[in-house]
Amino acid sequence: MNFHDLAIESIAYELPPVAVSTEQLVRRLDPVLRRFKIPVDAMLQLTGIIERRFWTRGHPMHLAATDVARRAIQRAGIAPGQVGILISTSVSKDYLEPSMASLVHGDLGLTQECRNFDLANACLGFLNGIEVAGRMIESGVADYALLVDGESAGDVVEATITRLQDPSTTLRDFWEAFATLTLGSAAVAMVLTKGSLSQTTHRVNGCVSLADTANSRLCMGTAERMVTDSTRLLKAGVVLAQKTWGVASNQLNRWSEQGIGHYICHQVGASHMQALVEALGISFAKCVLSYPTHGNVGPAAVPLTLALATESGRVKEGDHVALMGIGSGLNVTMMSVTW
């Protein structure tokens, strides 16, 4: 589906203060790795993740989301009262209810007329949020939409390490928990508006999505534990991505290896990125990587990577950028953006 008048007005991000290296995790897991005869460099070689960041223990995610949202509003050059839609796409939540969006809405002091709600779809949530907010903007619901996402992985990683250190842990337990050890934390926010109101050149051109919910149980997580069949998830995700690429090629303008300047994909790790590149026949050199220093930050990964790429000057005005996400479920979304 194509957008006709949708712009990205601003992006802001916040990185947690605590950096935790893969080497630190490996040291804590050394007895487990020795027992299963797993090389100590296996985690780094398989994931390509050097470090990830965690918030200080107990830091509320709605406060992290509020802080970064406030900066996104300021960068957009608008007043908080102009925000008509607020969507939180966080996997991490401080409470089952109220919604994260309502907490951020209250913290920011937004108007009573501002629609606010949570939208969750695993690691695909932020891209889904852009689509939903974009449709609402183009239908006239509001002039400005604010998307927020605050992710915290410290507690689940810590709980996973504690479980793996138990002498009763099996090799299967280790590999089912392996993906959890790649998780990181971050907060990100984005302001969307009508192209006719925008002060930027950043346009969302359109997006396509496909689902394969026969594979919805390959990654199942709670606040304390995540169990993942990484091999099957990778294979099924790549197959669905190939199908989605075909749909995108037919429905989105300039959607081809030749027409796309940069790929900003969901950031899982090195083996996943390489498999995706090979399956789609795209250039690895065009892929912007954030996982080496941030790990997998869930739905915050794509907007964070986009923000880092624009901040560094890698993505420049006028560049055609492909935003691509794969979320547990399985769901895949591919989105065309002209920066």
Name what the model sees in each region.
Residues 1-57, 166-239, 243, 326, ...:
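Condensing-enzyme catalytic core mediating Claisen C-C bond formation in acyl metabolism
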Residues 3-4, 80-84, 111-115, 139-145, ...:
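Short coil/turn connectors at secondary-structure junctions
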Residues 20, 97-99, 131, 156-161, ...:
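Short acidic, glycine/serine/threonine-rich loops at helix termini
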Residues 141-160, 212-216:
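Acyl-CoA/ACP chain-elongation machinery
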